[in-house]
C-alpha cells in the first residue's frame, strides 16, 4: 500500500521540525508528504523547503495557498490534493505533534488486513505546554482492552473520538464524501466529518495503542472558538449553514450513495437545518 501524509501549516516555524523528523524517520516511510501552508507570516515555508532539500526527500512538497483559507478549508484542499496521487492510505498531520516511529507501519498493517475498516484512528498522548491551551476530552471506548474498537453510530456532526492527527484512511473513503464538500461549508471540521461519516457507515475503528504525542499550546487552531453566545446573529446563521447544514447534506448524500437506511434520517436533519437557515 502506498501512503501519503497531508499536513496543514500556519506560522509553525517554531514547532514543525520535530513533527517533520518524526515523519521522515518512520519505519515505513511515506511515499508522499503534501504540505499546504495557509499564508504564514513567519519562516515556515522557507524552513520546510530547506528541510526537504537538505534531507533530499523525494515525494515531499509544500504548496503555499494564494489566499488564507482557514484551517478547515486548508485540510479540505489537502484531501482534494491526495486524490491526485496513487496513494492507497492517507494520513492526516498537524504541524506541531510527534509521531511514534511505527505509526504509519502499524496503521497500514491494520488497514491492509481488515477490509471492513476504511478509517483508523489511534490513541494519543497529550502534552500541554501553556495554560491557555485547550485540552480536548478523549472518548472512552467501552472495549478499549481489545486491539480495535469500532466507532459508535452518531447522527450528529460534532463527533470526535480522536484528534484528526491520529487518523489514517483508505483513499476510497475520501472518494465517498469529498465531492459533496462545498467550499462555502467552511466551518466544517475535517476530523469531525470523517469520524462521523465513518461511524454512520460502520467503517471506522480506533487502534487502542498510543501512536503519537499531540502538543497543545496557545497557537493550536483547533483550540480557538469562532462563534459564542455574544456573537452577532449573522455569525450564528453562518455557522448553521457552513457547519450544520453542510454536515447533514454531506451525510445524507453519502448514506444515500451507500443505500443506507440512515439516509432518510439525515435527510430530515438536513431539511430542518435548511429551514432554520432560511428563517
Region locations from a protein language model:
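Generic detector of well-ordered alpha-helical segments enriched in charged/polar residues
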Residues: 49, 153-154, 174-178, 238-241, ...
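Membrane-interface aromatic/basic loop that binds lipid-linked glycans or pyrophosphate carriers
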Residues: 253-279
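Catalytic core of nucleotide-sugar-dependent glycosyltransferases
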Residues: 146-147, 214-218, 223-260
Amino acid at each position: 500500500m502506498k501512503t501519503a501524509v497531508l499536513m496543514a501549516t500556519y506560522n509553525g516555524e517554531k514547532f514543525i521540525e520535530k513533527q517533520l523528523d518524526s515523519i521522515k524517520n518512520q519505519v515505513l516511510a511515506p511515499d508522499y508528504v503534501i504540505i499546504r501552508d495557509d499564508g504564514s507570516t513567519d519562516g515556515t515555508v522557507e524552513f520546510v523547503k530547506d528541510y526537504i532539500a537538505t534531507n533530499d526527500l523525494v515525494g515531499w512538497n509544500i504548496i503555499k495557498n494564494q489566499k488564507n483559507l482557514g484551517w478547515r478549508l486548508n485540510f479540505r484542499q489537502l484531501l482534494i490534493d491526495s486524490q491526485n496521487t496513487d496513494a492507497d492510505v492517507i494520513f492526516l498531520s498537524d504541524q506541531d505533534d510527534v509521531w511514534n516511529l511505527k505509526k504509519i507501519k502499524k496503521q497500514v498493517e491494520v488497514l491492509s488486513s481488515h477490509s471492513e475498516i476504511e478509517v483508523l484512528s489511534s490513541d494519543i498522548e497529550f502534552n500541554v505546554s501553556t495554560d491557555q491551551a485547550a485540552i480536548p476530552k478523549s472518548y472512552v471506548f467501552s472495549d478499549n482492552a481489545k486491539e480495535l474498537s469500532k466507532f459508535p453510530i452518531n447522527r450528529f456532526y460534532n463527533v470526535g473520538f480522536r484528534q484528526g492527527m491520529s487518523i489514517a484512511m483508505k483513499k476510497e473513503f475520501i472518494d465517498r464524501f469529498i465531492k459533496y464538500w462545498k467550499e462555502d461549508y467552511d466551518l466544517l471540521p475535517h476530523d469531525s466529518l470523517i469520524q462521523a461519516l465513518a461511524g454512520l457507515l460502520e467503517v471506522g475503528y480506533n487502534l487502542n495503542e498510543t501512536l503519537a504525542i499531540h502538543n497543545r499550546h496557545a497557537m493550536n487552531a483547533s483550540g480557538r472558538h469562532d462563534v459564542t453566545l455574544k456573537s452577532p446573529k449573522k455569525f450564528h446563521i453562518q455557522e448553521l449553514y457552513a457547519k450544520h447544514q453542510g454536515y447533514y447534506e454531506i451525510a445524507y448524500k453519502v448514506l444515500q450513495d451507500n443505500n443506507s437506511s440512515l439516509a432518510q434520517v439525515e435527510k430530515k436533519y438536513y431539511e430542518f437545518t435548511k429551514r432554520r437557515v432560511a428563517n
